[in-house]
Amino acid sequence: MNAESDPLFVQVARFVEDLVVDGSLEPGQRAPSTNELAAFHEINPATARKGLGILVDDGILEKRRGLGMFVTPEARERAVQARRERYAGEYLAPAIDEAVRLGYDRATLHTLIDRVAESRGMYQ
């Protein structure tokens, strides 16, 4: 799963959210069940259920009684928007803090960011 510092139920939510964002789970498709997630991640089903509950609360999944959880039509847009809102605090701030500790100036930091972005295919 994701960041080990996050509670397990948050890691489950992010795991399923990843499937939505990358297109592995499409709108209308059934999401993995709590038991499937629990078995896959070797966790308690209640923990998996709590993670799925986050996605229901966020409008990414919807419950269909007797059928399971399904991806909502607007799931990907909601998930991407939520991640964009978290991005600066969760990823950029720690990277900038480390750059300051290492004594990078602005130009060097920009060069490093460009180099990494290019190596990951961002500018193609």
Feature names for model-found ranges:
Residues R30-K63:
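N-terminal helix-turn-helix
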Residues S33, L67-P73:
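Minor-groove-contacting beta-hairpin "wing" of winged helix-turn-helix DNA-binding domains
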Residues M1-E36, F40, V80-A82, R86-Q124:
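Extreme N-terminal segment that seeds HTH/winged-HTH DNA-binding domains in transcriptional regulators
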Residues V16, I54-L55, F70, T111:
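Intrinsically disordered, low-complexity segments enriched in polar/charged small residues
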Residues R76-R78:
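A short, flexible beta-alpha/helix-coil linker loop
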Residues V21, E26, R49, R64-G66:
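Short glycine/serine/threonine-biased micro-segments
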